[in-house]
Design a protein with these regions (language model features):
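Alpha-helical transmembrane signal-anchor/signal-peptide segments
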Residues: 28-49
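Short extracytoplasmic
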Residues: 44-71
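N-terminal secretory signal peptides that target proteins for export/translocation
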Residues: 1-2
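A broad, low-specificity signal for short, low-complexity segments enriched in glycine/proline
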Residues: 25-34, 53-57, 83-88
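Hydrophobic membrane-insertion alpha-helices, especially the h-region
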Residues: 5-29
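Membrane-embedded segments
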Residues: 64, 70-159
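Short acidic/polar alpha-helix capping motifs at helix-coil junctions
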Residues: 20-23, 42-50, 75-76
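Secreted/periplasmic serine-hydrolase-like ester/acetyl group-modifying domain
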Residues: 127, 138-196
Length: 196
């Protein structure tokens, strides 16, 4: 094999691997940011979406374009079910409460969405004593460099996304019981991920 043919072959194989990885990552969608079809025993349950709630909720607010957004800590996440508060179909409510939320994180979520074109007319901030705990700022699942992953394509090619995609398939194939699932409204429940 000549060096020219080897280079062509290498480029072709590399391109194929990138395309396959791209398609695989979108199909599995471990963080529920692409809102594609959920297939039982493949990608229906998304257990890693809870641990990437900062990304998941950010993309979901942009996708769902709610009128009302709840922000706060896990008290908001566990305590406010938007399905119970939604009075009509035109009023979309989304729970953007996150585990170990703090004023800094609430500010980030609010600032991030009010700078973009959106339908948000009301923001409800849930407060509790732990919300003002300064130790929460250093939680490893919230990084101030999260802006890197605002681009979905960059996120697709991250190593953690690949591992979480494989774990999502493993979880669904083994019919593992997923106790913590973020539903379409951002509320933490144990029912499983509803269809969008």
């Amino acid at each position: 094999m000549s060096s020219k043919n080897f280079i062509k072959f290498f480029i072709y194989i590399t391109f194929c691997i990138f395309v396959l990885h791209f398609v695989f990552s979108i199909l599995v969608d471990p963080y529920n940011i692409w809102h594609n079809y959920k297939i039982k025993n493949f990608n229906h349950d998304k257990p890693k979406a809870f641990f990437q709630a900062y990304l998941n909720k950010d993309f979901n607010i942009n996708y769902l374009k709610p009128d009302t957004v709840f922000i706060g800590s896990s008290t908001v996440l566990l305590g406010f079910n938007p399905e119970n508060l939604q009075t009509n179909q035109n009023n979309q409510i989304y729970n953007s409460g996150v585990d170990s939320g703090s004023p800094k994180i609430a500010y980030y979520i609010l600032k991030n969405h009010l700078e973009k074109p959106n339908n948000v007319s009301r923001v409800l901030l849930g407060l509790d004593f732990y919300f003002f705990n300064n130790d929460l700022e250093d939680k490893k699942h919230f990084k101030t460099n999260i802006e890197i992953y605002k681009n979905k394509i960059v996120l697709l090619y991250s190593r953690s996304h690949l591992y979480d995609s494989l774990y999502t398939i493993y979880h669904n194939l083994n019919n593992s019981e997923n106790l913590l699932v973020i539903n379409n409204y951002g509320y933490l429940d144990s029912k499983g991920v509803e269809e969008m």
